[in-house]
Regions:
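Extended catalytic core of nucleotide-activated donor transferases of GT-like folds
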Residues: 143, 224-236, 246-248, 266, ...
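Conserved catalytic-core segment of nucleotide-activated headgroup transferases in glycan assembly
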Residues: 253, 259-267, 275, 385-480, ...
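Donor nucleotide-sugar binding/catalytic pocket of nucleotide-sugar-dependent glycosyltransferases
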Residues: 355-366, 373-391
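Short acidic alpha-helix that forms the nucleotide-activated donor recognition element
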Residues: 478-490, 511, 543-546
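Aromatic "clamp/platform" in nucleotide-sugar-dependent glycosyltransferases that forms part
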Residues: 498
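Short hydrophobic beta-strand element within catalytic cores of glycosyltransferases
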Residues: 515-518, 534-537
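A charged, aromatic-enriched C-terminal amphipathic alpha-helix characteristic of glycosyltransferases
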Residues: 555-559, 563, 575-607
Length: 617
């Protein structure tokens, strides 16, 4: 291959709507290592996820890169990804004889061992295995020198032909295996001289007593069960389990998508939907101390419906890491977020993971519907304030070091995400345009956690704060309730985002009674327009490669900074004349829109429909 890898085109060769296990066990057209193995859909999925290492180290547009990647799968991948260890067609292919130059030892090399040697340059064995010596060295390392232990191989993994090749004589003393050990072990040669009767007798005794402990002989002597073969991936079949749902996501993760599964749990509880929560850990850079739904977390699924509150790529990682057991026979719903205008072409294969998709906003729904082969349902998410937040109590400005007598605008973002999407610099620019340095009755609070100190946007924000004492930076990891108390201590939440899938932060600000200024684009428009938020006009702008995940061919909003500045001035003027509060009844309306009760009713209705359809089928 000479062209760069086009992931979407390669995945397009897989069958769709037959279940992930079956679809990903099919070979990818045009990707193979001749004489060793095809590259299967599951391989490509792993490679796609690992853009920081595997894509760099093993370019699939070269034969050597593909061979190196398959070697990595054998050496490391099968231990990291349960789904890979279950990829039966791959392992059956690797159990075949390697195609090598003929020699005394060539008939004992499997394709599995061939890939292992290719990936273990530290062994000093010619990776091409062209000579008899190299082939013998490979066999001895594997069966005679601990290789089987390094790879955690069992007797079930040793093909019958390889067993027969090495144990080719009824008498172990005269077998190829015994000769292999003698030729590579000078210590055995010295102790058991083969030209003497005593030496032969001693070697026979050693083979019987010591070899089973020092070598891989038991792998060759043990006969594995073959009457009942291992599970083979087949087109998806469902099981009939009791009413209820398994909610899957970052149960303890302190980030926005962790809130998705936590709010879904609260909605199910209020609606009387039986449920359990399966935790899937995010990256190590995410704090996992939110224990608000810990009482519902379990290790094993209990019900026949899965609702996966992760991104499509994290859902894929979940399948690859945990394997098929979590999904096999269960109706799986992908409650997937997305921010940009179009669903990524490179992610379309992920629809194989689900039976239907739930979209938390019309924005996501439209992006999904243009790409999805499975049904897409609009399912808004619940937004709930923690019990610790008392909206009737006095605000706590002094606690956060904020001035008591200013109109405060606030915005919060997670530095672990793409800062350019959240656009905090746009908020700073709008504030500076709205209010000259002589306007001392206003202030801007920028709350961030996990910022990248080297990020140029973050540096500009810090510089602006250093030059303008009205701008307050709070760079800290706060508990959820504390973040909301910070919001409540301010007057207006400003989000000049370029893209937003749902807009949970905006919704929380509304529940707290803050004025809201937000870009008139993204999932937030579902509730911002009806709620009377000040919406900022925008123009669609094409993204540059690397600006965001799957940016090629995408668009997002560029909010009008001048319009945002006018909105800030309007809020400040109104609040300076009188204490502006929510119109009568609007606070209650917000609770009706976002409440766990309202959302739980919608969930229950859809789940009941699914159970009824399942019963009829």
């Amino acid at each position: 291959m000479s062209q760069p890898i086009k992931i979407a085109e390669l995945f397009a060769s897989l069958p769709s709507q037959v279940g992930a296990e079956y679809a990903y066990s099919q070979p990818i057209t045009g990707l193979d290592v001749p004489g060793i193995s095809a590259i299967y859909g599951l391989h490509l999925a792993i490679w796609q996820l690992r853009d920081q290492d595997l894509q760099r180290d093993f370019p699939l547009d070269t034969l050597n890169g593909r061979c190196g990647f398959l070697a990595w799968c054998v050496l490391h991948g099968r231990h990291e990804y349960a789904a890979l260890s279950q990829l039966t067609p791959f392992w059956k292919t690797l159990s075949q004889r390697a195609i090598l130059p003929h020699s005394e030892w060539s008939g004992g090399i499997s394709r599995f061992l061939q890939l292992v040697i290719h990936g273990r340059s530290d062994l000093g064995i010619d990776p091409e295995l062209k000579t008899s010596d190299a082939q013998r060295d490979a066999l001895h390392w594997f069966f005679g020198s601990g290789g089987w232990q390094d790879l955690a191989v069992s007797a079930q993994d040793v093909p019958g032909w390889q067993r027969r090749f090495l144990l080719d004589q009824p008498d172990l003393l005269h077998s190829r295996f015994a000769r292999l050990l003698l030729e590579k072990r000078p210590d055995l040669q010295a102790i058991f001289r083969q030209e003497t009767i005593a030496g032969l007798a001693g070697f026979r005794s050693w083979l019987a007593q010591s070899a089973p402990h020092e070598t891989g002989l038991p792998l060759l002597q043990k006969i594995p069960l073959q009457a009942w073969p291992e599970h083979t991936a087949q087109p998806f079949q469902r099981c009939n389990e009791s009413f209820g749902v398994n909610l899957i996501g970052y149960a303890f993760g302190e980030l926005g998508i962790g809130e998705d599964v936590r709010m879904a749990a609260h909605a199910c509880q209020v609606a009387g939907i039986p449920f359990c929560v399966i935790d899937f850990a995010p990256g190590s850079n995410v704090r996992q101390q939110d224990r608000s739904i810990a009482q519902w977390v379990t290790d094993t699924p209990r019900y026949g419906i899965n609702i996966v509150c992760l991104t499509a790529m994290e859902h894929l990682r979940l399948f690859l890491t945990r394997g098929a057991e979590l999904f096999r026979g269960r109706y799986t719903i992908g409650y997937w977020p997305w921010e940009l205008h179009n669903w990524p072409a490179n992610w379309e294969h992920c629809f194989n993971l689900i039976d239907e998709a739930w979209a938390s906003s019309r924005h996501i729904e439209q992006a999904m519907q243009r790409a999805s082969p499975v049904p897409v349902h609009w399912m808004p998410m619940a937004v709930r304030l923690p019990d610790e937040v008392d909206t009737t109590a006095l605000h706590q400005r002094s606690r956060f070091g904020l001035p008591p007598d200013k109109t405060l605008f606030v915005f919060s973002f997670d530095g672990n995400s793409f800062i350019s999407r959240k656009n905090p610099l746009g908020v700073v620019e709008a504030f500076k345009r709205a209010f000259t340095t002589t306007d001392q009755h206003v202030g801007l609070v920028i709350k961030c956690m996990r910022p990248d100190s080297k990020n140029s946007i973050w540096k500009q924000i810090l510089s602006a704060a250093q030059n303008d004492p009205r701008i307050f930076i709070i760079d800290a990891m706060l508990e959820k309730a504390d973040v909301l108390e910070l919001y409540r201590a301010c007057d207006c939440f400003v989000s000049l985002h370029r893209a937003e899938g749902f807009g949970r932060g905006i919704a929380e600000a509304m529940l707290l009674g803050l004025q809201v200024i937000a870009t008139d684009y993204g999932g937030n428009t579902d509730f911002c327009r009806a709620a009377g938020a000040r919406l900022v006009p925008f123009r669609l702008q094409a993204l540059e490669p690397g600006e965001y995940i799957e940016a090629v061919g995408q668009f997002w909003a560029e909010p009008n900074i001048g319009a945002a500045a006018h909105a800030m001035i309007d809020v400040a003027n109104r609040l300076s004349r009188e204490t502006e509060s929510l119109p009568l009844g609007l606070g209650q309306r917000y609770n009706e829109i976002f409440s766990t009760t309202a959302i739980g009713v919608v969930y229950r209705r859809r789940i009941a429909d699914l159970i009824e359809l399942k019963r009829k089928s």
